[in-house]
Amino acid sequence: MSDDLERTSDDTLIAAIAAGRPEALTALFRRRHADVYRFALHMSGTPALADDVTQDVFLIVMRDAPRYEPGRSSVTAWLRGIARNCVRQRLDRDSRLESLAATPEDDGALPVVQPDPLGEMSRVERIAMLRRAVLALPVRYREVVVLCDLEELTYADAADALECATGTVRSRLHRARAMLAMRLVELQAEEERRVTTRDRSLDVTVTQKRCMA
């Protein structure tokens, strides 16, 4: 692979792919496959599915590169948009896709939550619980949290990936964050109940052993 391709812009790589240069696809894959995989993993929570989606995305890039319009959307947003559709198709195929109509857009009152719902948990525990909470969100809200908060895309790029207006991204993200915080509170409460039950069971076991001694 030439050094020129390694140093060229994403837009130029897409143009080279459209012109039938396979080495350009290899260069784009090396540069962007980790981003696509990470997005798919955040959305699905399944490494195998994320691997499949990543392969699907770059096959579609090879096919659809001539349709890419520089200036209308960034390559970052374009790839996320393709990945988003691939994730939905994979989840739907596995019968795990929530109905997009199940949770309508709602401008009503948002839940009130604690400022830090994860409290004194360790970093590893916090990350694990955050992942569970994100995966529990309805797809339309999970997407915007992943794109804007985890992937740190701009509102404009997120809107391009989601094929909606930037205002929709902002309002959906506002609600998604509130839903996420509420879910984190619920998960922490569940964990506290689990720990309490475990500790009580240990106390009973210790007491029984002492009585039998």
Question: For the regions a protein language model found, what residue spans apply to each?
Answer:
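Amphipathic, Lys/Arg- and hydrophobic-enriched alpha-helical face
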Residues: 29-47, 64, 134, 186
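Intrinsic, short, N-terminal disordered tails of RNA polymerase sigma-factor systems
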Residues: 1-15, 19, 23, 27-31, ...
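Short, charged helix-capping/linker segments at alpha-helix termini
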Residues: 2-4, 18-27, 37-56
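Structural recognition of an alpha-helix C-terminal capping motif at a helix-to-coil junction
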Residues: 38, 52-59, 73-85
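Sigma70-family region 2
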Residues: 18-19, 42-46, 56-73, 93-95
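Arg/Lys-rich amphipathic alpha helix in sigma70-family domain 2
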Residues: 63-70, 80-102, 123, 175, ...
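DNA major-groove recognition helix of helix-turn-helix
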Residues: 54, 173, 180, 184
